[in-house]
Each structure stands twice: as C-alpha cells, then as structure tokens.
Amino acid sequence: MVAAAAADALAAGGDSSSPSDLYNKITGQQSSTTTSLSYAACDVITRHLISMLLEISNWTNDLAKYLAGSEQSSDDGHNERCLLFSSIFFAIDPSLALAQMSSVASKHALLIALGGFSIAALFVWYINKKDKDGRKKKKVGDVISNGLPKTATASDVQTENGNVKKANGHVNGDVQSSIGVSQKQQQKDEDEKTQKKDAVQNEKPSIDKKQPKSQAPTEKKEEKTVEIHTETEETDHVAAGDSGVVSEHKEHDKKTKQKNDEPVSIDKKSEEIEVPKQAGVVNEEPKKQSEETVVEEQFVKKEEPKLKSAPTPLLTMPSKKKVLENEQIPEEPTPTKMNDATSPLSLDIAAQMSPASFSWSEEMEKSFNEEEFRLNESSDIDRSPASPLRHLQQQHNKNRSSQKRKGGRVNGRDGVHQPQQQHQQQKKEEQGQIKKGQRRLTKEKSVEETPEKSQKRVVLKHHENEAGDAAHAQIIESPHHENASYEKSDSPGLDSQNSEASSQDSGRATGPLASPHEDGLTTEDDFLPMYEFEIPNSLVGLIIGVKGKTIKELSVRTNVRMLIRQHHETDKVKTHQICQVRGKRDEINHCLQMLRRRFPPARFPELNLQPVVPPVLPNSNFDMLSTQPTWLTLPEDIKCEVAVSSIISASHFFIQQPTHPSFASLRHLDMYMGSLYGEQSNLPELPIPCQNGLLCAAPVGNAWFRAVTVQYFDETDEVFVKFVDYGGYSKMARQDLRQIRTDLMSLPFQSTEVMLAHVRPVDGTTNWSDAAMQKFRAMCIGKVINCKMVGQSHDTRIPMVELYMMSKDGKDAQEVRFDQVLMNCGLARTADPSKMSRITVPAALDTESRMKRPSFSSQTSQTAVVC
C-alpha cells in the first residue's frame, strides 16, 4: 500500500520532495484513512527498504522523463522504447490498488512490483548508455582517420583496421586505435631526427638499381595485411553461419601462408637507400605502414586459436606404437605434449618403454600373487586389531600359502620341498637373464613365504575357516568327543566347570534361550515334532553350560533345536522352567538319552524328563486377555470381500474374509497343529461327559483343525462338532478329539456362519433342489465375492447377508445379487420378510459380543463357548 501511494505521488509530480518526506506524507495519509489496514508489522528494516525503493522510484521517474524527452535518433528506436517503458510504469492506478488491498501480502506484492519496474528502468538506462558510447567511439575513429596523411597505403590500412575492430569487438578496437595513435606520434619525432643523419651518411645513393629490392618486402607485408583482412572476414562469416565462404577463405589462407613461409632476405643497404633526400616524407609512410601492420598482425595472431577450430595434436609417435604392438607389451599412457619427435626427451621416453627395460618386471610378475598383495595392502581399518576383517584376512593368507606350497612340492617322498617360485628362479638363473641383486630379492621373498607351522595345523585352520562361513557352527569330530568317552564321563558336580556356581549363567531363563543351532534352521523346521519337559532352576545353568557349551553340543550332535523358556504355570514360575526340544522323533530320543547319561537319576532325581502338556485354562481366575478366543464379525450395511468356505445349503453356508490381516496366519496355524498333534499320541482327550461349547482339536484326514463341540451323544460316545476356521459340521468319536492348548487360541476364528436373505426354496419347504445347489456352487465356489450384512434370523440369530456377483450382459458388467439370480432362474422365491429383523449397531454388537465371549464350565481344563 505504501508503494502504491509512492507510485501515485511520483506520477503526480512529487519529485521535489525527498524520499523521507514523501514517506512521512504517505504514512500520514494512510493513518487518516479508515478503510485501509494499518502497517503494524512494519519494523525498522521494512521502513529502510521502503525509503530506498521510494528513492529509486524518484530517480526512475526522472530517468523516464529524461529518456522520453531526449532527441530522437534516426538510427535506432531508443525514444520509442523509453516512451513505452514510461507508459507502463505510470499505468498503475494507486487509488484502485488501495481500494483492493485487504492484506499485508498484497502490499508486499506492490512493493515487489515497484522494485521490478525500478530494475527495468536501470536496464533501459544501461542499454541507452551503451549505445551512445558505441556511437562516440565511431566518431573518434573517423576523426583519427581524417587526421592521418591521405595516401593509398594509409587508406588500406585504415579499412583493414576497421575490419579487425568489427571482428574483435569494440574493446579490442579501442586498444588498437590507441596503440596506433601513440606509435605514430613517436615515429614522427624519431623519423625527423633520423632523416638528417641518413641524408649525410648516404652521399651516393643508387636509387634506380636497388629500388625493386626495397619494394619486395613492402609488397609481402601488404600481402600479410590482406591476410589479416581475410581472417577477420572469416570470423564474421563464421559468426553468421556461412560455411561456404569460410572454406574459400581457408584455401586462400593456405596459399598465402605458403608464400609467406619462403625466406625473405632484406639487406641493411636496401633499408638505408629506401630514404632519399628529395622525397623523405613520401618514403616515410611505407615504413610506418609496415610497423603498424606488424603490430596488428601480432595482435590478431594471438586471437587466432579462439576464432578458429581446435588445434591439431602436436606430435604423435607411430614408431613407438609399432614397437609396442610387435613386442606385445601393454601400452603406457602417451604424453600429452612433446616438443619434437627427435628431441632428447622423446628418445629417452622411447628407450624407457622398450621391451628390454621390462625384463626384470616380467620375471617378477610370475612370482607375484595379486590376490595376496591386495589383502596385504588393504586399508588401515582392515588391518587394525579391532577390525573383524583382520582375522579373516590372516586365515585367508595362510590358506592361500598352504595351497601354493602343496601345489609346488616336486618330490615329497625324498623329503625335498621345492616351491614353484624357486624352481622357476633357478631356470632363469641358468639362462642368465636376472642380475645378482634381483635374485637376492626373489630369494628373500621366497624365504618369507616358507611355512612356520606344519601342514596339518594349516589344514585344521582351513577347516575351521570353512566352518565359520557356514550358516551354523559345526564341531569337528575328535577322540575327545566320541560317544564312548561321553558316556563314561563323570556327571557334573559342585566342583565341576559346568556347575551352577562356576557357570556364568544365573540359572534363571528370563526369556527364551535357544541353542545356536536355531539360526541355521529353515521355516519348515518350525513345524517339526516338539517335546517339552520341566527343569528345576538349580539345573538350568548345568544344562546350558559355560557360554552355552553343553546345550550347543547337545543340539549339534543330535541335530535338534533346544529352547529354554519360562514356565507357563504361575505356581511353578519361580521354581521350574520349560525345556523344549524340536526335531525328528529319533533325534529327540537321542537328545534325551544323552541328557539322561549326563544327568543320571541317581544323582539328579529332581530332573524329570516326562512330557509336560500345559492345560488349556488352569482355572476360572486365569487372565483371558492374551488367550481369549474371538470370532470375526461382518460390518453392517457395508460391502466386504468374502469367500465361501463351506456350503450346507443354498441359503446356509460359511464364509471367510481373505482380506483380513489375520487370514495369512491360518496356514501356519494348520501346519503347526499338524506337527504338534500328529506326532504325539499321549495328548489328553476330552472328558466324559463332554459339555457343549468346548474348544478342541479335531482330526480330518492327516490334518488337525480347531473345532467346538455342539452336542454330545451318550449312547455312542460321539460328539457333534463345528469347525471354527473353515466351517461345517461333523460327528466324530470322543476318543479322536484332543484338548487344545492356550497358545493355539490367539488367532481369531476365521469362519462366519451366515444365511442368504430374501429367498427360500420354491416348494416352500427347507429343502433346496439339486439344481439350486449346483447353481449356487457355480456362482460362489473358488471366487471372491462381495457380501453385505442386512439383518439376522429371528429363530437362530444367525446373520443374514446379501451376496453380489459381476455379470457380463454384452459389453457392460453389472453387479447382481444371488437371490435375484436364483429367482430369475425359477429356483427360489421370495422369503417371508417377518422372519428377518434389521438390527441396529448396538444390538449387533451385543449379539456378537455374546457369541464371542467364552463361558466356563466345571471342567476347568477346557474352554466352553456359547455357539
């Protein structure tokens, strides 16, 4: 706003007032207005900035008026440009800007615009000043040319100087003109003094005979001036893009250079005779012209590399390349600059690169190990004591040296150890191609590589290195680790190294402690058979051993994975822990036998290797937050993607939600239950009588799935169960069902039992026809469809849903409901709407919470769920 007012004041002609007075005047007007906003955020820096912009604007106004009122030139349109700028600058309407300004941002924008116009004014002033300076330089050049003596050669020189100025720019032209004027004045004074001396000395000049010789050099110098003129024209054509003219001038330059390269002999006598007594002034001009052309020629030649193309390479050495190719020696980088091919420097370089100079290096190259050199010449970080790569490099070097010594043995029966390097060196010594000092170096190198340790030790190191690179550590078989010695070894006591007092372990496993063999197992090993037993806290340190030595040995020798974790029973957490052994059945038995030999029952009666199966729920006071079984529910009136997992009828089925985050864990749960219940046959069965709603594990073929009891038949001792993850019902013998562990209940039940809304069978009964069943299966089996919950049944309280599928009728795909498709096919009819109630959100939550909250019976070892 301040800047707009400043522009208004400048446009009104407020040039006489100073910027500070103008600013105070504008701010006073601003405070008097009620519609405009106050500049509360304007600090000292902003005030200085506004004052500076007002001062620039004041100067810009004066400059615009001056440029608008300046004399019009016929050569260019400076006056029109200034008038255009002044009209744009004063086109701002301050009153309109003040009326439209409603924020500080708009005021800042006007300040920026004012600064931009000021910068544009400076640019216009600079261009005008530059053009005027160029016109002044042209006038000065005309005055200088008029002041010189008018001769034919002088006019040619002036035209050539003008062309040089055009080619090199105004700056180079000014330098040349100033040099020419100063030199001419000095030459006039010197020539007047030398004329008198030359006239006295040359009493008998022979002008008629020697004058043609004196004219020859002047003609050649004139040719040089013409050459300068052609070069300047060439640069002008290059700037304009005329390639044809440039090529013609280049051909002309080659011819003139060939002429100029010829030797020109100028005698002193011809120069002396060139100055006669009668026409002293006339003969002075060619001499002046020659000196001027020499100066201009030197100046132009300095600029030649910039005007012409890139220079050609200085020198090449074809003979050197031929020698390298014939001798098959790797080429060295050629020098970038060389003075002469026959110079001493080039000869020395060629001699150094000859094949004879590489005789010693070729010999040493055969005994040079590049890989070992790189390892030895590694960085300081790799060779530092704290670097983990240091020990690996030392082992790698020893392995490489051992392999080399093993391959270099010539005759091992006689006990003569002769490496390959010494054998090759002796051959070269016989031929006489290596000097004595060089042989001494190779001998020292071979002595350094001789082994200090036996080959057996190196081989052991080699095996240890390979074992370190494996996924898990392996213990090397030795007589100390034989089974017989292990069985005969004494059991640990209080004075043993593996006793609890001497062990570094505290005896309490606060978290899961596994053997190192666990890292090398794959994901398939997670579903191997598992065996768990109790360990007293007093024996945990003995089983683990010093730094895990005992548990590591048991795991590696029996190929199992051992895990020590906290006990699951609250009353035994402080006294016992659980040891878990995972592997194949034979491997688990082998591990338990070795553990029993190590800890015999006579000395360690508290160690009981009997299996421990944790109860599902110890008592009714158990915290159910971490192991509470839950059901997946459907959102109300919202479509979601589902898959039909089990079909009872066309209107009664089970669905799964494959997009739920927990659905991916179902496959792992099935594999885990198959490995757990398939290998162990001594797991507890369901009690008699079996209560309804108990969670259990039910076998189907070779797999085990989670199920819940629905009805128990006393006569046949059978149980009717419902599978909670895949849906469906089945009648099974009670002896086949097993109690379920608490850790298997953390995953929510994946299947949801639903009914199809709005339809019923055609005959009015509850039995659907085979055609309706086939049609329903064809629409949903193996597909992901959309589902929306619309209510629940009055009788069974089962959720009722609408299923949607995509049908392609022509080009457009439409979404249709299953019930409409069945009715259009004549396989179903409309159901009674009174049997379905649309539930609200609180009622749905209450029903679902009642369905998923488990209840407990008097049988404390099972979970009862109301279905």
Swiss-Prot record:
GO terms for cellular component: membrane; mitochondrion. Residues 397-408 have a biased composition (Basic residues). Keywords: Membrane, RNA-binding, Transmembrane, Transmembrane helix. It is found in: Membrane. InterPro entries: KH-I_AKAP1 (IPR047368), KH_dom (IPR004087), KH_dom_type_1 (IPR004088), KH_dom_type_1_sf (IPR036612), SNase_OB-fold_sf (IPR035437), Tudor (IPR002999), Tudor_AKAP1 (IPR047367), Tudor_domain_containing (IPR050621). CDD domains: KH-I_AKAP1, Tudor_AKAP1. Residues 186-211, 218-239, 247-275, 298-307, 363-383, 441-458, 481-490 have a biased composition (Basic and acidic residues). GO terms for molecular function: RNA binding. Residues 152-162, 336-345, 494-507 have a biased composition (Polar residues). The chain crosses the membrane at residues 108-128. Residues 689-747 form the Tudor domain. It is a single-pass membrane protein. The keyword Ion transport does not apply. Residues 145-458, 481-523 are annotated as: Disordered. Pfam families: KH_1, TUDOR. The keyword Transmembrane applies. Residues 528-595 form the KH domain. Its main location: membrane. PANTHER family: A-KINASE ANCHORING PROTEIN 1, TUDOR DOMAIN CONTAINING PROTEIN. This is KH domain-containing protein akap-1. It comes from Caenorhabditis elegans. The lineage of its organism: Eukaryota, Metazoa, Ecdysozoa, Nematoda, Chromadorea. The gene is akap-1.
